[in-house]
């Protein structure tokens, strides 16, 4: 069985790029809740790198910013 990408007219997976690197961010502000909401699920969980395409360099400060926003009650810990 051939890979789908090798077949004519097959499915080609798009490479994910880091949002923060692409838009030349210098830091992530925990008060920017609209940005942080893009990286959490509807249940309030932090989305993993493999889903968002965020680089390891930016995933760590992103997680810290989300946790700070939760602690300051800007983002919910869970949504029901």
Curated annotation (Swiss-Prot):
Ribonucleoprotein among keywords: yes
Listed GO biological process terms: translation
InterPro entries from the UniProt entry: Ribosomal_bS18, Ribosomal_bS18_CS, Ribosomal_bS18_sf
Coiled coil: none
Signal sequence bounds: none
One Gene Ontology cellular component annotation held by this UniProt entry: cytosolic small ribosomal subunit
Gene3D superfamilies assigned to the protein according to its UniProt record, in alphabetical order: Ribosomal protein S18
Pfam families per UniProt: Ribosomal_S18
Molecular function per GO: small ribosomal subunit rRNA binding; structural constituent of ribosome
Alphabetical keyword list: Ribonucleoprotein, Ribosomal protein, RNA-binding, rRNA-binding
Domain of life of the source: Bacteria
Subunit note: Part of the 30S ribosomal subunit. Forms a tight heterodimer with protein bS6.
PANTHER family membership: 30S RIBOSOMAL PROTEIN S18, SMALL RIBOSOMAL SUBUNIT PROTEIN BS18M
Family as reported in the entry's similarity comment: Belongs to the bacterial ribosomal protein bS18 family.
Role according to the record: Binds as a heterodimer with protein bS6 to the central domain of the 16S rRNA, where it helps stabilize the platform of the 30S subunit.
Designated name of the protein: Small ribosomal subunit protein bS18
Species whose genome carries this gene: Acholeplasma laidlawii (strain PG-8A)
Organism lineage string: Bacteria, Bacillati, Mycoplasmatota, Mollicutes, Acholeplasmatales
